[in-house]
Amino acid sequence: MCAILQKAAQESGLKTKFYFEDKGEAARVAGSFVPCGKLLLLADEETADETLALKETFTDFRVYFAVQGKQESANGLFSLPDDVRAAVAVGGRSIAAARFFCTLRGACLVAIPARCSAAEIFCPRSEGGYPVNEPDAVLFDENFARGRAEGAAVAALSALYAEDIDIDGVFSGARKDAGYEMLRLSASLAVQVGAKVGRAPKESGRRRAGSGERLFESLCLQEIALMACPRLPSRAFYHLLSGKGAPLGECAFAALHYAQARYAALFENGRPRRYFVPDYAARARRAAEYVGEEAFANIKVPSAEECFAAAEIFEESRLHFAAAAEALGAYAEKIRRVYYAEGGKKPLFASGALEEAFSLAADLSPMLSVGALERDLGAVHMRGGAYGAKSGAKF
């Protein structure tokens, strides 16, 4: 188990134990929670064959094997006997379904990701909105899990999320919580995906984490951190892009590079217009289409004194944040190399889609972000509800 990740989980009140081993160890891990009895072995359609091959290793259990189809709900699992005491789920859909099943049945769950993703492991609710428990154990096999390009792009968003917290802290005075340090650590691990880490020398008696394991650790730390700070503007930006149906890796990659370019443009070249007043009501109505009446609480219309104070803080902090944006740009360039080296695809969005989503994201969070500062300070001319500035982002 990774000590850093395990400590972060425990400090966040999570019971999950993490194992970085071959998926063939699933029976042993499950047996450490429940020594025998009836067990559900659940697989996605894509992982069915490899999961079925594990069945013979569960010698101390009576195994019920099932496949979770793409359009199937978890309700079909409740036809299983009431005394199923454990479940092993392989793949994202299976993990989500098994979490719902095990929460209601009081069974323990071992989750085996089939992709470099942690979202389905820590999402607090099922698709139907029911609160679900986290898995008792997560077994990550880096030789089995796919999708490193997507995982690296999503993990790299931790750096962007941390910048959101930094900017809001300076302009609003908000304090940073434990999630901030986790995001910084997550970001540092994300760039190690392409590193040649391999195995430790045999004589050392230690096992060195592979780059896939570090990536998964980064993703888990990000998800744990977001439990403490879920309403980040950059996260809203990413979710708006992913809602357009593009692959998650492409959305994350585009969000990182576009937001960094807007960040740099604001603090390097932005000029506040002290008497500019945006149409807050129109923006709130637009945001309410996505989050309901909550949007009207997110957008706080500043007084003239608050606008002048924000403009002063902007000038005082300009050099600091311009340097931070430059550092984020260097980080994004490292992620670019990792992303394409792992087979990532170039993001393709319709004209204006990035500008529109970035503009709207500022109104979906109560935090003072780059987009919110552009809005409140009138630092960038607005056109048709979207910012008209050229991003300078390079994909």
Roles of regions detected by a PLM:
Residues 176-320:
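Active-site segments that bind and position negatively charged phosphate/pyrophosphate groups
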Residues 10, 140-147, 153-166, 188-206, ...:
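Generic secondary-structure signature for well-ordered alpha-helical cores
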Residues 100-187, 294:
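A glycine/threonine-rich phosphate-anchoring loop and its flanking beta-alpha core
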Residues 49-51, 91-100, 118-121, 234-235:
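Short glycine/serine/threonine-rich phosphate/pyrophosphate-binding segments
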Residues 60-65, 108-114, 248:
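Short hydrophobic/aromatic-enriched beta-strand-loop microsegments
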Residues 42-45, 89-91, 113, 140:
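Short beta-strand/turn micro-motifs composed of small residues
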Residues 1-4, 8-9, 267-395:
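C-terminal charged capping/lid subdomain of soluble metabolic enzymes
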Residues 1-86, 386:
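ATP/NTP phosphate-donor binding region
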